[in-house]
Amino acid sequence: MKLVLNNRDEVFDGNQHTVSEIFKIMNFTFPRVVVKLNGKLIKKPQYHETIVNDGDNLEVIHLISGG
């Protein structure tokens, strides 16, 4: 499966994965993120059920706070 992840072409085994599976494959462990799939905001409770398909555009924005 090919997709655009954070403006980079990525290739994964299989035809589809959930957002949570992509996080695990990519070792994303950020505590606060904003996720958009094909321009649509995906809320954290939906990560396990939201399917990412071949050709999709997935954006994972890591939020950082500081003082």
Where are the regions a protein language model picked out?
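Ubiquitin-like/PB1-type beta-grasp interaction modules and other compact soluble beta-rich domains
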Residues: 1-66
